[in-house]
């Protein structure tokens, strides 16, 4: 599960950067 957290943060970060 801990391995999923960084991936989710990376996705949110990419979305925020794109926006």
From Swiss-Prot:
Swiss-Prot/TrEMBL keywords: Amidation, Amphibian defense peptide, Antibiotic, Antimicrobial, Secreted
Entry comment describing in which tissues the protein is expressed: Expressed by the skin glands.
Residues with PTM Asparagine amide: 19
An individual GO BP term: defense response to bacterium
Places the protein is found: Secreted
The species this protein was found in: Pithecopus hypochondrialis (Orange-legged leaf frog)
Protein name listed in UniProt: Phylloseptin-H1
Keyword Secreted: yes
GO CC terms of this entry: extracellular region
Family per record: Belongs to the frog skin active peptide (FSAP) family. Phylloseptin subfamily.
Function: Has antibacterial activity against the Gram-positive bacteria S.aureus and E.faecalis and the Gram-negative bacteria E.coli and P.aeruginosa. No hemolytic activity.
């Amino acid at each position: 599960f801990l391995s999923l957290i960084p991936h989710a943060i990376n996705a949110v970060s990419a979305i925020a950067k794109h926006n």
